[in-house]
């Protein structure tokens, strides 16, 4: 196996078990809770997911921060010293400045120190477990003996084939994060509107349709995955949830019965969870290429 370290970040929502299975590492983003800085921890060591989502439900002020330069250095430098090349699969540049920080502030300095090594900082144009799925597929290619250039090129050529469909329980947290206007959130909550989000071909998250009520929103998620999923590509399917385990189980049962898919349920972590709030749920797969653009009316 080639000496390649595959990194992603806190936005990828890959569990401890999955990261160990595929030998994937990650760099930490951060959250700030009522002024107190904390790591955006996918292992849930410093706080449990129920505690995190409880903070949001209590109305505590939570915001997110991107990966810092020291965090990159502390993780990348030891790998380079050991002779590894690095592929960093990053959260969409439309949602985080982490990939830009890596490309402009971290990579040049480290390549001066380690001129024989290679570092790829790849904008996944995605987030949450669809970003994580890209890292998994990269790890499979590494295990198959592909070179760092081959793995990185495959990711660049195929990253738009990773799809997600997501919905939220309330529009309040999207409003707090500045994603929608206050009036839309107010009237949407009153009407029971559940927006269905995807990531477009430029890495923007946008609403493709609106469902009335929880049952209809779950149906839209399932239908979206059915349309996008391509079983012949042989990738995992994930269901992400933030205090929505019962709905995640419902989707899992439907996917097993209707598509014979054994989907894995995972927590939606602190980065996406802060923006979307308790009750967020999403499905993720490798499938058809994303060709939509925000505002294209399709």
Regions found by a protein language model. Name each.
Residues 57-93, 100-104, 148, 152:
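Glycine-rich phosphate- or other oxyanion-binding loops that anchor nucleotides, phosphorylated ligands
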